């Protein structure tokens, strides 16, 4: 093992390697309101005590290194070091522990998710003394969160911009995700928006490929938006993906979207990076654009139970970096997502104050103070039969996004959109009348089918479609 010792006033420098726990394991420490707190799930190597492993995590993610260095004496490690202040075994797991680490605020640059993550989830994740390490949760104190702008606009401002209240918003990802020409792509957008959707979406893969350059796509999509608005009398939008190979190109695409007068653009925040995302978020607030966020690559980071970063941490990071929507899983669709865990980080995205609740995976009470909220987006393998459950689970402040569940309608895109809109409004009305959607949701849809042939056709097509697999990431 390897670490660093604290050099106290009057003590001489003693070279060598000493246990991390001598300096970084401090069970007597009382956390401060200004500390950033982290909960790590750690699996030590055989023979490594959990106290030493927890101290190593605190050291290597803050001021420590593998040996004592004489420059320790030029600063105050006691002021700047991370501290492992508690360790608890994980119930039902062999040799797994939750290590709680407190970091002083001065370790991190203000307003920089990039710097925060570089320290807390940096080199320590490759540390040999650990078989595996996962960051389960972070407590971001108001003293730090107030250094971030957060979402460009937030939930209430978005509703005011698009003039839609009292129900979830409806979206659709255009399929096939790759291969359409810009003109045919715009046609699909128009049909979906005219049929009753609020938004359509670029797939996360769509940037500027040879079959459809970004500028052509933006032009045809803008035409589709304005035509559908004129015909329906509703404000419509399409998530134009501004993600690009450089920040300069990304901002150029965002500027062109603003010139066209569209209401919303999109970014892949993990593949694009937090620095790029924060820059784009600032641009969107300054220029009145809503910002939809896709989480492509998240499962590489968050799906394994014992190593990586839980999505609740990535969700908090996005709220600080900036985005008005983010994909959050569906609970009922084709993508990973256990109900209570999903609802836990959905609350972390939307609410101002979230109490500690280990039953939902929330390790710390989180106070966002006045930071705007983010709309969770349920997307992936959902169709009209899921509408009652989605309405009940996610509530009004959400975006329900049906790709194949719109474009796969046997009568075409516009009827597919109409089916989803009718299903949603029927579920919202039934809920508002006091009906239990968990028990009577299917009956609500069958009743609505009597006056919507589009919905009846959709219900017939997808009546047997289910995605019943065991969730990997459980509490």
Swiss-Prot record:
Its EC number is 4.1.1.39. One of its GO terms (cellular component) is chloroplast. It is an enzyme of class 4 (lyase). It is found in: Plastid, Chloroplast. SUPFAM superfamilies: RuBisCo, C-terminal domain (SSF51649), RuBisCO, large subunit, small (N-terminal) domain (SSF54966). The modification N6,N6,N6-trimethyllysine is found at residue 14. The active site is at 175 (proton acceptor), 294 (proton acceptor). One of its GO terms (molecular function) is ribulose-bisphosphate carboxylase activity. Keywords: Acetylation, Calvin cycle, Carbon dioxide fixation, Chloroplast, Disulfide bond, Lyase, Magnesium, Metal-binding, Methylation, Monooxygenase, Oxidoreductase, Photorespiration, Photosynthesis, Plastid. The record marks 334 as: Transition state stabilizer. Binds 1 Mg(2+) ion per subunit. Residues 1-2 form a propeptide. The keyword Oxidoreductase applies. One of its GO terms (biological process) is photorespiration. Heterohexadecamer of 8 large chains and 8 small chains; disulfide-linked. The disulfide link is formed within the large subunit homodimers. RuBisCO catalyzes two reactions: the carboxylation of D-ribulose 1,5-bisphosphate, the primary event in carbon dioxide fixation, as well as the oxidative fragmentation of the pentose substrate in the photorespiration process. Both reactions occur simultaneously and in competition at the same active site. HAMAP family: RuBisCO_L_type1 (MF_01338). This is Ribulose bisphosphate carboxylase large chain. It comes from Chaetosphaeridium globosum. The gene is rbcL.
């Amino acid at each position: 093992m390897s670490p660093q010792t604290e050099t106290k006033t009057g003590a001489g420098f003693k070279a060598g390697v000493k246990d991390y726990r001598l300096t970084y394991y401090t069970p007597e420490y009382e956390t401060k309101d200004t500390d950033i707190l982290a909960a790590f799930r750690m699996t030590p190597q055989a023979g490594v005590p959990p106290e030493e492993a927890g101290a190593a995590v605190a050291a290597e993610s803050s001021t420590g290194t593998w040996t004592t260095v004489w420059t320790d004496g030029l600063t105050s490690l006691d002021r700047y070091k991370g501290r492992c202040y508690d360790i608890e075994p994980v119930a039902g797991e062999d040799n797994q522990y939750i290590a709680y680490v407190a970091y002083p605020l001065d370790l991190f640059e203000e307003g920089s998710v990039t710097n925060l993550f570089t320290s807390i989830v940096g080199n320590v994740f490759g540390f040999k003394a650990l078989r595996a390490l996962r960051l389960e949760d972070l407590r971001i104190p108001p003293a730090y969160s107030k250094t971030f702008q957060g979402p460009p606009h937030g939930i209430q401002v978005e509703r005011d911009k698009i003039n839609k209240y009292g129900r979830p918003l409806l979206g659709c990802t255009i399929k096939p995700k790759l291969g359409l020409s810009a003109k045919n792509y715009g046609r699909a957008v128009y049909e979906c928006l005219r049929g009753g959707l609020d938004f359509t979406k670029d797939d996360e893969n769509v940037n500027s490929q040879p079959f459809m350059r970004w500028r052509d796509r933006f032009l045809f999509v803008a035409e589709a938006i304005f035509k559908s608005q004129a015909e329906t009398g509703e404000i419509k939008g399409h998530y134009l993906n501004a993600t690009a190979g450089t920040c300069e190109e990304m901002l150029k695409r965002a500027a062109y979207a603003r010139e066209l007068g569209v209401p919303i653009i999109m970014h892949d925040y993990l593949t694009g990076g937090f620095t790029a995302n924060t820059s784009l978020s600032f641009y969107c607030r300054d220029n009145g654009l809503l910002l939809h966020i896709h989480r492509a690559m998240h499962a590489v980071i968050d799906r394994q139970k014992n190593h990586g970063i839980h999505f609740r941490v990535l969700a908090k990071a996005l709220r600080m970096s900036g985005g008005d929507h983010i994909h959050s899983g569906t609970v009922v669709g084709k993508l990973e997502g256990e109900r209570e865990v999903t609802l836990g980080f959905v609350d972390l995205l939307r609410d101002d104050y979230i109490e500690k609740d280990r039953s939902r995976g929330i390790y710390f009470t989180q106070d966002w103070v006045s930071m705007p909220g983010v709309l969770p987006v349920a997307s992936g393998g959902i169709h009209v039969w899921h509408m009652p459950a989605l309405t009940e689970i996610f509530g009004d402040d959400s975006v329900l996004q049906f790709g194949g569940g719109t474009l796969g309608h046997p009568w075409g895109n516009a009827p597919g959109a109409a089916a989803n809109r009718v299903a949603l409004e029927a579920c919202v009305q039934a809920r508002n009348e006091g009906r239990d959607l968990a028990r009577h949701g299917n009956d609500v849809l069958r009743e609505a089918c009597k006056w919507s042939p589009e919905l009846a056709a959709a219900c017939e097509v997808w009546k047997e479609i289910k995605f019943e697999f065991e969730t990997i990431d459980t509490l």
